[in-house]
Each structure stands twice: as structure tokens, then as C-alpha cells.
């Protein structure tokens, strides 16, 4: 018996950095103070359909760090990728983009954030792994906001 059913496929076409920003705030005073940092993280995922089989995903990570309640730095990167996804439903494609593709881009974004912070004169920041599956499920279960 021959199976003529087309199998789903996934291919990474390109991984690239779309935007990088690092800003030291309150320098040089911030380097003279006792270092007692607190950081806020923001993650944003945007997808763009290029054509029926190709999609761009932008993973933006923003880190805002304060030292003793005074802003010290803001580091931001948008790491992007182009992915070819075939023979999947729209719901499956959405899931693959927001989970697997985001997980693929995260290590690249993490390295750029870490490098920017160190080159900015600060101690390295340990960005923990991100559970993109949980973020996606939360996003899918939350009510949609009207604009």
C-alpha cells in the first residue's frame, strides 16, 4: 500500500539579528555605586507570513536593569528567522512558530544580550531558559483585546 499523503515539513531558512540596542543610563555614576541590581524582562513574538510556505518570526527581548532603584541599562535585541513550513494547518503553523521557532532563536538573542551587557561594562546576566510552550498556551487562552 502506497501512502500518497504529503508529510508536514519544517526548515530553517535563515537566522539573523534584526535590531540591537544597548543604553547605559546614569553613567559614569552607576559604575561607582554598590551593585545591587534588579532586572525586568519583556518578551515579544511577532510573526509575518511571507507567502504560503515561508514565515518570518521576530523574537524581541528587552532587559531593563536598575541598581538601587536607579536605571542602570536597557538592553534589547530582535532576533529573527525565516522558516519554511509545509503541509500543516494554520493552527499547527501558529504553534510551531510561537514555540519551536522561538526556542530556536532564543540562544542567539541570549548571546547578544549577554555580550551587550558585558561590553557595556556590567556583570553578566544569567537569562534563564524560557518556556515558550507555556507562553503560547497562556496567549491562546487569554481573551483577545480589541483595539
From Swiss-Prot:
Gene3D superfamilies: SecB-like. Keywords: Chaperone, Cytoplasm, Protein transport, Translocation, Transport. It comes from the Bacteria. Coiled coil: none annotated. Its main location: cytoplasm. GO terms for molecular function: unfolded protein binding. GO terms for cellular component: cytoplasm. It is found in: Cytoplasm. One of the proteins required for the normal export of preproteins out of the cell cytoplasm. It is a molecular chaperone that binds to a subset of precursor proteins, maintaining them in a translocation-competent state. It also specifically binds to its receptor SecA. Homotetramer, a dimer of dimers. One homotetramer interacts with 1 SecA dimer. Belongs to the SecB family. This is Protein-export protein SecB 2.
